[in-house]
A protein has these predicted regions:
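Glyoxalase I/VOC metalloenzyme domain signal
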Residues: 2-9, 14-34, 52-112, 119-284
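Short acidic/glycine-enriched loop/turn segments that link adjacent beta-strands
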Residues: 41-44
Length: 284
């Protein structure tokens, strides 16, 4: 039975070494990037968001080493930049935490935090969240998962931030590479109480819930066959590999220019040009 307080993918977290440089890179790729946010002191992190509907991407960087960001720092040290964790939307984080506890996963949290937000009219407000994590050791495909309850959606989904020159509209898939995709997919499906779905090329998908993006687990070789002509240099053998983004493909092609590679009926940014994250723009 699916979790009642956890619905599908809320956002993908791309861990980066230099936050400001990463934001500039994503602007060059045609994304509208939010002003920089600084999280509560115990988090020790800062971010930029790239807002879609109903989901988003987060560029996350460590500003001050803290106990809370130790796993993120360890990830950067081991893997370099890339998709470090995936957030689900939480309806109620306290109840969601109890739901996963009942399924044998002691939750980390709930944790409350916030960050100041400069609104389009120049006023300063706050984005407030309550999150909980599955145990950090439970990382299917090498990617941690957590759930995020948005207390102030109006300071996160700001209309001016949701229009992108590259035509990006929403996340369609989170691509995860692994030597044994079926085992990793089964691990995730158990954690979120969902079913797996076998795909024609041997990849295994896990719907995240609702109408949100799917997880797709596949080998690096399978990923290469899905996106011929796209260099996968820099991707780990096991970990978050990329995001499939529903978009206006013509707008993406124009905005990306030489950074984009025409492949699989869309236009693709190789991971080396996307801070360790392959970005595949496909027809919305």
């Amino acid at each position: 039975m699916a979790l009642k307080n956890v619905i599908g993918i809320d956002h993908a977290v791309v861990m980066v070494k230099d936050l400001d440089k990463a934001a500039e890179n994503y602007k060059r790729l045609g994304f509208t990037v939010s002003p920089r946010g600084t999280h509560s002191a115990h988090m020790g992190s800062g971010n930029y968001t790239i807002m879609f509907d109903p989901d988003y991407m987060e560029l996350l960087g460590v500003l001050t080493p803290t106990e809370h960001n130790a796993p993120a720092r360890a990830y950067l040290e081991k893997n370099g930049e890339g998709i470090e964790r995936i957030a689900f939307t939480a309806v109620d984080s306290a109840e969601g935490a109890e739901e996963i506890r009942a399924r044998g996963y002691p939750p980390v949290g709930p944790t409350d935090f916030e960050r100041p937000v400069t609104m389009p009219d120049g006023t300063v407000s706050a984005a407030k969240f309550r999150t909980f994590q599955w145990p950090t050791a439970e990382a299917p495909g090498g990617v941690r998962i957590f759930a995020c309850q948005h207390k102030t959606r109006e300071t996160v989904w700001i209309p001016e931030l949701m229009k992108h020159a590259n035509g990006a509209r929403r996340l369609k898939q989170v691509l995860m590479v692994a030597p044994e995709p079926a085992a990793e997919a089964a691990h995730l499906a158990k954690m979120i109480d969902r079913e797996t779905r076998n795909e024609a090329d041997g990849a295994v998908a896990v719907p995240s819930g609702g109408d949100r993006a799917d997880f797709v687990f596949l080998t690096k070789d399978q990923l290469g066959k899905r996106y011929p002509g796209v260099s996968l240099a820099g991707l780990p053998a096991r970990g978050g590999a990329g995001l499939v983004i529903a978009a206006d493909v013509a707008a993406a092609e124009k905005a990306l220019g030489v950074a984009g590679v025409n492949s699989a009926g869309g236009v693709v940014v190789p991971p080396a040009a996307g801070n360790g994250t392959m970005l595949a723009f496909v027809k919305a």
